Amino acid sequence: IYPVLVIKNTRLEKEFLDEKYTPLTVVQAVETCKELMSMFNQKGIEVIRVGLQNTDEITDPNIEGSEVVAGPYHETFRQLVERAMYYDMVVEKIKKFNTKVKEVEIRVNPQTVNNVVGYKRQNIEKLKEFYDVDVIVKQDIKYPVEKIDVVVTKEYKDFLEEDEKELSMKK
């Protein structure tokens, strides 16, 4: 799966410079490739490469000598996609709990831990920011590489429940 990069001295570069073509951002490309990889995985189709291999010419557009003018270039693009997929798996598992989750423990194989945690802990930070969930990651060599388990370790108490308990204690 190769997101489109604008390469120097191509027709696409001209269209880009003439503002007739707008490349995807890295975030947009990760989201698109994540959906494609999920679809292929469900069909049992192995994805052997995601994103162009880094070379002297195919590298960050900001580096001198790069032939890439614009587009969703990242030297570890596949890992960004895989980490986004693991984030979605964790969120899906958390949403299945019929409770207000305050803290979870994620159990993973040590080979998978980087995908679960995310680049610069982004997945952990997003869980805290968007779902107000604290995360403890436990590594277990017994877990298969692709498997993760999410266990609720703390729940938020409903303020109405707390008020009812206080009232019944006062009686």
Model-predicted regions and their roles:
Residues 1-18, 25-56, 97:
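Conserved C-terminal portion of the radical SAM core fold
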Residues 20-28, 82, 119:
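Alpha-helix N-cap and loop-to-helix initiation/capping positions
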Residues 22-34, 160-170:
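Short, basic, helix/turn surface patches
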Residues 57-171:
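Radical SAM enzyme core and accessory elements
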Residues 18-20, 62:
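A generic membrane alpha-helix/interface feature
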